């Protein structure tokens, strides 16, 4: 599968109801505490990888892979040795 451009990805997630699309960059080894968001999130990792933990479930999300998080879901993130960059659409 070919990685879409930022504009193509933005159009895809806006079609799912996203109001905004952001570029998020995280440093190598960065970790977030458990938190939740007041929006649905649709992301595409474009560089690096991170581990997404929701309860007892962990998933490593790598370059070229997508993830979805529904609003109000408690989760944490741990970024790999290269850090990560992802594009994320937010649906309020």
State the predicted function of each range.
Residues 20-37, 71-72:
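Conserved short histidine dyad/triad with adjacent acidic residue
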Residues 27, 38, 54-56, 79-81:
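A generic beta-sheet turn/junction motif
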Residues 36-52:
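Short, conserved beta-strand element in jelly-roll/cupin
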Residues 55-72:
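Short acidic-glycine-tyrosine-enriched beta hairpin
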Residues 71-92:
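Ligand-binding loop in jelly-roll beta-barrel domains
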């Amino acid at each position: 599968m070919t990685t879409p451009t930022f504009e193509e990805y933005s159009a895809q997630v806006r079609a799912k109801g996203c109001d905004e699309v952001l570029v998020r960059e995280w440093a190598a080894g960065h970790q977030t505490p458990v938190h939740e968001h007041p929006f649905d999130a649709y992301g595409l990792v474009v560089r690096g990888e991170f581990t997404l933990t929701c309860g007892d479930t962990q998933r490593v999300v790598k370059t070229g892979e997508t993830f979805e998080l529904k609003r109000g879901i408690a989760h944490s993130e741990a970024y790999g040795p290269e850090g990560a960059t992802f594009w994320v659409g937010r649906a309020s």
